[in-house]
UniProtKB/Swiss-Prot annotation:
Region feature (Disordered): 1-27
Protein name: Putative non-structural protein 2
Organism: Micromonas pusilla reovirus (isolate Netherlands/2005)
Gene symbol of the encoding locus: S8
Superkingdom per UniProt: Viruses
Composition skew (Basic and acidic residues), residue ranges: 1-12
Amino acid sequence: MSDTNEENRDEPTVVIVGPNDAQTETTDSTVNVETSSDADKNRVALEANINAQVVAMDEDQYYDQLELRANEVAADAEIYEAPDQPANYRNSGIIDLYDEAKDFLDSSATPQWNDKFWGLIDMGGHCNAGANAIFRTVIKALLYKKYYGAFPIIGDEYDSNKQDMVGSSKDSFYTILGLRNNDKPGKLTHIEAAILDMCTNLVCSQRNPKVWFFVSDAQVGRFMLDFQKHMEVRYGQNAHGSISIFTGPIPLRERNYGQNEGSLDLYEVAQVLQCVQNAETDHQVYQLATSPNQLYFKTRVAVKDGQDVIKHVPVEGGLYVKTYAPEFKHPEKLDGQYVEPRYEGNEIGKDVEYTLMDPTTDYHRVGASRVKRYGDTLMEYTETIPRPECGLIVLLNQCYYFAKARLNPFALLEMRLRSRGGAANRIVSRWLEKGEPLMAHDVVQTLENVVLDGAMQN
């Protein structure tokens, strides 16, 4: 696929309503929380009051209110980072994160790489610091957008327990976000509501923006569906044109949690985006790379020991990814089709049965993989993904392992950084040349200290 149609494609007609342009009939954005006490009622009243005020605010007022609200939520929910975290990640509350981000932005040179840039917000943290990590990344992105007019690639995550997603860190992550509130399925907690408001502003502050949520299981998927409902309440039906929510499960490749290998890889997300191409009215596919050039993958599919072995080999300096797909139950039905995995329970290693899905009507239910298989023969093909004008990608839940795996999300910077050379190139040299994983916060700190202070302005 090439970008020859980039200039000629029809732009979709999407009206994005901002904070001071909200439609009169959609200003009632009371958070949908069932109350059982005076405290709950007071909180709901506060939510409704804030939401009602937001529609009349200009941008500066909105950000000021956002700062106050984040601090109130932090105090109410007692969101504090785990005590065994590194000193530079120990903060007393959300307001400290906001001040830290503001100081960082005020003291940084205007980056040269934000022209029509899009963001990857890494909603990481699978311990008691999870909610704080979420607010940190969202607030930094909001601030960056406010000061520089574009979203950065920012991430921050830390797993104090060093446990896999099946362990207690997973449970505590759900608990923080209120996603295990089984007594009130489909209802938002006040913490979720604050996150929704922040993300909503991110989405609606861009002209014709795109936002994609990739989630890995039904619990977090419900949160994403709540986000969609929230968008409809706040901004009306036009929100449909700006958001694509992919509910889980995203296919779990064969993983070794003990070595923190596996998780989402670049090509796996690209497969989801291929599904978007067939589902959205503007028929666009969106690139997961910061380079203006095309990123090519030569993909080889073979069968080894009863499994499909998929290797993605870089062409013209791309990225190398290797994943192992589970054995297909009905491979004869999958030739060139999109499929959706069905899981039995949450246990790793369960057999996965792939069933066909219709990408033109069912693209909100993802885990989509386009599969071609011809017996045990080797098959090769090449796919490209054009870059978007702007957009925001939010990775939930699996991003911790995404960052620690051989392909971490900040490898998306690889082509841009390599083209600059010098200090910027050293940011990813450990991962690129030695295969050592870079934690997301390592890359963030390097970006703050090296990239944004002028190292990339050559």
